[in-house]
Amino acid sequence: MKKIILFLTLLSVGATAQNQSVSFKKNDAEKKIDVLIGGKYFTSYFYPGESVLKKAVLFPILSAKGTTITRGYPIAPRAGERTDHPHHVGMWLNYEDVNGYDYWNNSTAIVKSLQSHKMGTIFHDAVLSTKSNKSTGELVVTATWVDDDGKGQKVLSEKTTYVFSGTSDTRTVDRITTLTAISDLVVFKDVKDGMFAIRLARQLEIPSNKPDVFTDAHGVETKVPVLDNTGVSGDYISSEGIKGEAVWSTRATWMNLTGVMDNHPINVAIFDHPSNVSYPSYWHARGYGLFAVNPLGAKVFSNGKDVRNLTLKKGESVTFRYRTLIADKNMSKSELDLMQSKFAKEVK
């Protein structure tokens, strides 16, 4: 009898961890591609154009249980959430200083203090392919980075592969982005704001009882006010064991955000890859909901002890690889270490 019970327990665990099918639903009218896992909506590759967003994003992002883990503002605002940094939308990849142009802070609602910046825009070009099997789905897209707020020179060509997977209680996204220089010389200046990021729901912020002021590389300040902390439960922990706000500017192979939404645990973990520039990367993870990894911001994060300007000559490329896990449960350090190891082996 004990053997039967043990067998059934193992069978149950195996079923829970089994990958579900991934499918895609194209919506040309709304300029998005919906991603479904196990028949349930997960996210959309959203490319509405520069009149709405200055880059394509994954938005919104839901957990396996249907909990929305991304902030709604400015696309679909929800009551009680912050309305700072309108360029923080869903999940994205861009950078603050490429040949002197700011791709990170660009939006349709640039605050007055940023209006002197020279902005850049990332244009969605094409969906190259979508394909699925029983356990994963792959979406391949291209884009072009253009300076002078999208009216100037083509600077970089982008090819991004998204790989989606999920189980009954997890969702996983791999983003592999290759940037190739179109200009004769492309310089990613060592600055704070970049590179791969998610803007999280209010409930996943770290509770705070004081206002904050954040300053960018140009000395521009952004004020983040105090809000009601009811239901706010977020906290960070890094692969190195550092917790809370202290993770900002530290280096780690992975970073996990823990919290509670809809009365159950939510974990959102981002994994760096050994082949990435500056591995293990610096983390630009803030308590107010910005969860970012920036391999090129060494000067700011190390107080000037380290500098990581990246230069590409025409035709040269750089690839960034990140895995994101959204779990409707708490993940242990050993589980996250194992996922990090698997990511390193599975993606080259």
Give the ranges of each region predicted by the language model.
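Bacterial Sec-dependent N-terminal signal peptides
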Residues: 1-20
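Beta-strand-rich N-terminal accessory domains
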Residues: 18-86, 176, 191, 329-331, ...
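Extracellular/lumen-exposed scaffold segments
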Residues: 28, 52-110, 217-251
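Acidic (Asp/Glu-rich), glycine- and aromatic
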Residues: 45-50, 56-60, 167-215, 226
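Extended, loop-rich substrate-binding clefts of extracytoplasmic carbohydrate-active enzymes
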Residues: 85-169
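Beta-strand elements of well-folded, non-transmembrane domains
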Residues: 143-149, 162-166, 179-183, 200-204, ...
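Active-site/ligand-binding surface loops and adjacent short beta/alpha elements
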Residues: 191-277
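Beta-strand-rich recognition/accessory modules
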Residues: 268-348
